[in-house]
Regions:
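Sec-dependent N-terminal signal peptides of Gram-positive bacterial secreted proteins and lipoproteins
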Residues: 1-31, 35-36, 40
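C-terminal domain-boundary segment and adjacent tail
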Residues: 87-116, 211, 237-256, 263-269
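Low-complexity, Gly/Ser/Thr/Pro-rich intrinsically disordered linker/tail segments
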Residues: 267-283
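Metal-dependent polysaccharide deacetylase catalytic core of the NodB/CE4 family, i.e.
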Residues: 66, 71-79, 122-124, 132-136, ...
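N-terminal, intrinsically disordered, polar/charged segments of Gram-positive cell-envelope systems
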Residues: 24-68
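Charged, often glycine-rich, active-site loop that binds/positions anionic groups
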Residues: 112-127
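Glycine-enriched alpha-helix->loop->beta-strand junction motifs that scaffold or abut catalytic
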Residues: 15, 146-148, 177-179, 237-243
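N-terminal structural segment of carbohydrate-active enzymes
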Residues: 63-104
Length: 283
């Protein structure tokens, strides 16, 4: 063959070889491409999750007035009218679950009342006053089992008292996601009998303790025995609270005084019909 023809054939072979190499990716190239796709998918999922966490209320809808039954419990045990036995508490939590109620966190309740927005029609806020030990040993397992959430109104000066929750208990329960904590003052005194300065100390100190130890912004104060006066409301605001819980009966609404929210007391021996009435009626 002529030298020019040989050079042409060789050149054509090299070109075809290079073209084949470009079209058939090596295993390493395929693996890198696969890893890149997975990373991209993870990035999209992570971004969507972050956006959801950054905007937790994006799917809530606006209403003219929020009607929020706030259930009031204390000890989950037997003994007196402030104690609801665990068996009855479980029946009531099961009722909420089977009837499609959404139990709000304290932050969600504050948001709902302040912005008049709700996630669904059937909502309820469960509160347990006085931070009794049985809130952890009796109520908490039931709440987890029925997938409900509750707020414990915590007496910050009682952490070393018998039959009350410790800080370690509170941290453990908070981490579960079923429980949050709001303030019930430091010493559980009748606020309306105290001077303004002592009231302010009780309110401010308990909020600072909860904020620091539980790494949160405590927005709600629950009045001990429901007792408060106009000076208390002034102290609430100065201490940095957004809402306050009383013991006056009734379903809370977004048009109520935010520093005097009504609650529905759950008592032992209550029938499910009576319990249902607490969720739907002010009577």
């Amino acid at each position: 063959m002529h030298m020019r023809g040989i050079n042409f054939v060789l050149g054509l072979g090299v070109a075809l070889g290079l073209l084949a190499g470009c079209q058939a990716a090596s295993p390493a190239t395929k693996q890198a491409s696969s890893q890149s796709s997975k990373t991209s998918a993870k990035s999209v999922h992570s971004s969507a999750k972050h956006q959801s966490q950054a905007r937790p209320y994006q799917h809530w809808h606006t209403v003219k007035d929020v009607h929020l039954p706030i259930l009031m419990y204390h000890s989950i045990s037997s003994g007196n009218q402030l104690r609801v036995p665990a068996k009855e508490f479980k029946t009531e939590m099961t009722y909420l679950k089977t009837h499609g109620y959404r139990t709000l966190t304290a932050n969600e309740a504050v948001y709902a009342l302040k912005h008049r927005r709700i996630p669904q029609k059937k909502i309820v806020w469960i509160t347990l006053d006085d931070s009794y030990k049985d809130n952890m040993t009796a109520a908490w397992p039931i709440l987890k089992q029925t997938h409900q959430h509750a707020t414990i109104n915590f007496i910050t000066g009682f952490t070393h008292k018998k039959n009350h929750l410790t800080l370690a208990d509170a941290k453990r329960m908070q981490a579960s996601g079923n429980i949050d904590f709001q303030s019930h003052t430091v010493r559980h005194l009748d606020l309306n009998n105290l001077t303004y300065q002592v009231q302010l100390t009780e309110l401010s100190s308990s909020k600072k303790w909860l904020d620091h130890n539980l790494q949160q912004n405590t927005q709600v104060i629950c009045y001990p025995a429901g007792r408060a006066n106009q000076q208390t409301i002034k102290a609430d605001k100065q201490a940095g609270y957004q809402y306050a819980l009383s013991t006056a009966p009734g379903i809370a609404t977004s048009t109520q005084n935010p520093y005097n929210l009504t609650r529905q007391r759950v008592v032992p021996g209550m029938s499910l019909t009576a319990f249902q009435t607490l969720l739907t009626s002010n009577n």
